[in-house]
Amino acid sequence: MLVYYGGSALSVQSKKKILELTVSGVSDLNAVYFYLIYTKSNSSLNCESLRPILSDLQESEFKPDGTTMVYVFPRPGTISPWSSKATNIANVCGYKDVIRIERGIAYSVVFKDDISEEMLKSALNHLYDRMTEALRFKLPEEDEVFDKHEPAPLVRIELNCGQGGDKQAATERLNHANKKFGLALAPDEIDYLVECYTSEPSLKSREPTDVELFMFGQVNSEHCRHKIFNADWTIDGEKKDYSLFKMIRNTHLKNPQYTISAYSDNAAVFEGNSGTLFAPVNGIWSMKDEPVEFLGKVETHNHPTAVSPFPGAATGSGGEIRDEGAVGQGSLSKAGLAGYSVSDLNIPGYKQPWELDVGKPYHIATSLDIMLEAPIGSSAFNNEFGRPCINGYFRTFCMEVPRGDGTLEIRGYHKPIMAAGGIGRIRKQHAFKKSIAPGSPIIVLGGPALLVGLGGGAASSMNAGEGSEELDFASVQRGNPEMQRRAQMVIDACTTMDENIIQSIHDVGAGGVSNALPELVHDAGLGARFELRDIPCIEPSMSPMQIWCCESQERYVLSVKSEDLDTFKSICERERCPYGVVGYSTVEQRLILTDRLYNTTPIDLPMEVLFGKPPKMSRVAETQTIPLSKFDSSLKSYLAPSSDPILDAVERVLRMPAVASKSFLITIGDRSVTGLIARDQMVGPWQVPVADVGVTVTSYGKGINTGEALAMGEKPISALVSAAASARMAVAECIMNLVAASIPALDRIRLSANWMAAPSHPGEGAKLYEAVQAIGLELCPSLGISIPVGKDSMSMSMKWNEDGREKSVTAPLSLIITGFSPVDDLYSIWTPQLRKVEDIGSTSLIFIDLANGKQRLGGSILAQSYKQLGDEVPDLDNLDTFKNFINVITQLHKTNYIQAYHDKSDGGLFVTLSEMAFAGHVGIECELDSLSSDNIAALFNEELGAVIQVCDRDIAKVLELFAANGLSTCVHRIGKVLSGQAQTISFSRSGKIIFKSTRSKLHGIWHETSYKMQEIRDNPECARQEMENIADNNDPGLGYHLTFDPNVSVTADLALTSRPKVAILREQGVNGYLEMAYAFYASGFTAVDVHMTDILSGRVHLDDFVGIAACGGFSYGDVLGSGNGWATSILLHEDARNEFYRFFNERKDTFGLGICNGCQLFSRLKSLIPGAKSWPMFTFNESAQYEGRAVMLKIDETSGSKSIFTESMAGSSLPVVVAHGEGRAVFDSESDYEQFKKEGLDLIYYVNNYNERTSRYPFNPNGSRDAIAGVRSPCGRFLAMMPHPERVVLKVANSYYPHSKASEWGVHGPWIRLFQSARKWVG
């Protein structure tokens, strides 16, 4: 094993954070990476020879005097995602002697002299993640990192229950195994297993293996089998006719139309719109008209996120993406969402008056840590895989609530909710799994087995604190999204064939292949014979049980016909995606797993034992009535007499995380990848995160103006008062959000219902039944909508001992509703952005009150902010009123009367109107005379309703439409938008102002929570600058200042008789190929799919192309530096290097475009690009965070005229999207910078909204020197840029464009010109 130290592992910000967290025990620290390179025994590799891939290697030792050395490295027995990718790079780059590379961090720590043992332990805990890392005071030994132990053998569990053995003793032994392995088996299931091993002829002659028992525990866990939802219920002594699941299925039974597949697969499939399949056919990107069906799914990953937030949330999103990719014969995730519920944040120095700190179990993360780390984990997976995340929610809650006996208990989210969901697309002919032919090869596709995620299905089925700490840690997985992207590329290659070779596919999730492989063949009515050692596995010491049951991520199981196996293998090899043919299906319905290494049979079971009918669960529940107090809407009971009640309420409500800006959760995510996003969370010229709905475009294709919408709704605090009302309001809120998009009709909406509960907690089982009944048997059938998909998590409580006292926190019943619908007009997506008087004339604000004057405050944000629950909560009281409102809204979408729309929800009418003003940077004046005389109740109740902005000239028509639908009494003309720059927000009654402030002040308060989180997590200076920008009333926002007419095609006057070939170049991990291919395809090129394996193998030569386009994404997961692995694989491969050298240097008819990861590639290939020696490298953003934003770019007037891409765009400035973590332009030397400026290679740069070159964040999102965003070669034929023009080629894909351009620009926006210009140059 070679050991070398590397560069600094601590940024200024991260060092500061650690010192702040360890202030009581540490006075100083520094850190560098250290690399452990495991090589073949006779290898001659050394520091110098490894530097091309590990550029920061140092031969000297890192051990400063007077410090204590602390070494952090991946947990023994595990392989980090970093190691997998780094080793992959080394092998691709020709380092055949490298077996594995691992990386750790060496800290040199100066501890304070008086540090106690407890302080030392606390300080060390801040240096590593116990779930994924180990800590030592010396460098790890080779055997500790590079496990060379012999494989562990099979274990048999001695039940002694066969041949007339004692069943009671066997039951006791199995109970012991149940606790030891964390199987979460119920007593009746233990009895069932004992009976099976007693009476089943093929089993009673032997003892069960640990593999069999562990598999049974996973397959039959609550997580996988949903026992509570399938149980028989008796409530208050009355036996119920329906199971919970039967009530949910009732919605589909009553309304099956428009749903293609429900309850039978990893996601539900819905009828979509007409569109196209745009995909490579024999390598050529081609477009084919066909229906585009879409699918929906929402998962939760609560337990892992509580234990270790980053990997827990990352694998939550990753698992849900796999669900969407493994429907029928194969599918594809298209856009995602993420939601979080946690207890109070308790931000240091920013504690809010409603917050509680009741402690937590030692090994569970705090709510603050969860919200600092989990969203990064989820976003990182989405970003790297290449799925835009365009919707979500965030709620905090922790409160003392009375029990039925009047004593108090804590209700909150110590067991957090981490929701991950989304929509995908599927070809109609692939919506159902095909029958698997007997004898078909069964394949595991994706990453290898790893010693992670053991028992996750069972662990998540237990209330937190019931299992052991070590079992909790063992049950959490780790994510490798770049591997999952490779697997998805294999699936895509199969599904775009005329005849898909995949017969059936399942994702590997809870229980690992022990659940997925049996399920795959069982669904087909078959058995199977598997060989354990054919399952890809890179940790040799793993036992049979660990290989079979581990939840290693990024895996799928599938079947193909024998005659298609070679084709499938060739696809995998092209994509460098691991796979294993692990067995074959059999007619006999028996599951057999052999182990040729030990010549054993770890599993030999009839399928009916595994999937048979263990005893059905029966649940008995009692209704619990708790004493409730009416909320004092005057607030006098909660405030000092001198307080201003409305001002106090405003400031509390705007700071509540459920209301406050979610910017810190949004800009960390890529919301533009694919180029098919028509509506993300950020709204308008000032990009304020207030959108109600996320919308995707159906597909690329001429004239396509349709899409798919998704939105969420949840009202969990109300469930503490009325579970039925909470459920109805969650459905209603979701629909109110969804109709901001133009949906065809109410009956096209389909829902996912995700149920979180602690049904064993007093009263909670009855509440769960009440809520399911309210929407399953009553509301949804009445609305004509259904719930064809969903999930449940039935262990939402946390228990622990602290100082000898037992503590517990139990979540309220939490129903998360996600709605999905086709969209029939992408140009009629309403946002909350109020339009300015100067742009459209005088307007009115109309409030539609669907509660007909009721103003119940129970369960509201206002009540929570005063630590109150209330006694009466909002409800959907009048179904006809609600349906008529939706009918009016769908009709209004066919007009141009509505200028802005926002539903009323968390925070009430005050928040609805304020957010609309924030988004529009306008002032508003509102009058409450037509509402209840209780001002606070009128402003902060959360009854159903919405606000619309209507031009005064259109008011009569809009009011007439509401009247025609019986809604006249619901409509209130309550305000107007003010002209000018004053931007005041005021509310009055009877001519007297009851509240007045400024947009900038309220906007600042609303953004404060996000700012505080960014200040802790990211570069605090960047967070401060973004906060300060809010106060600028004169900020004109994003704008289009064009020197060209987008309607005029620069190729129109050319006689284009051919489509020259452009290589759409990608490497493993690249995810931005679709939008790049379309941009060139739409501009008159033949776009050709070229993987680096095509070039390295010699199958493809660049001589055949006039252009290359290196796409964005995460080649090799950005390990060893963004673009570095990709570039090094070219530079160190003689044939590939020559291919690129010839393309760049020996031909004058070529051009090249590198975007994002492709830009980073070009900058590292600058030695091959003529005149590019002075180009900068692109490194970590100054914000220390991934940045997904819409920003302003300017094309330099002089330099722009010298580039073939921008000659007709020179001098223009316009918005574009950025999506990168490493985009800051840094020069190798000052002389390079001077040469670069002298030659005028600075082509594109960031400007602020005043059209000025800027270093200020977030206008310059990465801190690039001179705001550099894109560079050109001296000849003008090669362009490298970090922003993504290809993602906003479609006009509707721009997060903001002027309303006046909706019809003027046609299908494409201004950035199509960049690609058309290349086509013009080719001629």
Swiss-Prot record:
PANTHER family: PHOSPHORIBOSYLFORMYLGLYCINAMIDINE SYNTHASE. Pathway: Purine metabolism; IMP biosynthesis via de novo pathway; 5-amino-1-(5-phospho-D-ribosyl)imidazole from N(2)-formyl-N(1)-(5-phospho-D-ribosyl)glycinamide: step 1/2. Phosphoribosylformylglycinamidine synthase involved in the purines biosynthetic pathway. Catalyzes the ATP-dependent conversion of formylglycinamide ribonucleotide (FGAR) and glutamine to yield formylglycinamidine ribonucleotide (FGAM) and glutamate. This is Phosphoribosylformylglycinamidine synthase. Residues 1062-1306 form the Glutamine amidotransferase type-1 domain. InterPro entries: Class_I_gatase-like, FGAR-AT_N, FGAR-AT_PurM_N-like, PurL_large, PurL_linker, PurM-like_C_dom, PurM-like_C_sf, PurM-like_N_sf. The lineage of its organism: Eukaryota, Fungi, Dikarya, Ascomycota, Taphrinomycotina. GO terms for cellular component: cytoplasm; Golgi apparatus; vacuolar membrane. PROSITE patterns: GATASE_TYPE_1. It is found in: Cytoplasm. In the N-terminal section; belongs to the FGAMS family. It catalyses: N(2)-formyl-N(1)-(5-phospho-beta-D-ribosyl)glycinamide + L-glutamine + ATP + H2O = 2-formamido-N(1)-(5-O-phospho-beta-D-ribosyl)acetamidine + L-glutamate + ADP + phosphate + H(+). One of its GO terms (molecular function) is phosphoribosylformylglycinamidine synthase activity. It comes from the Eukaryota. Mg(2+) binds at residues 692, 733, 737, 903. GO terms for biological process: 'de novo' IMP biosynthetic process; negative regulation of TORC1 signaling; purine nucleotide biosynthetic process.
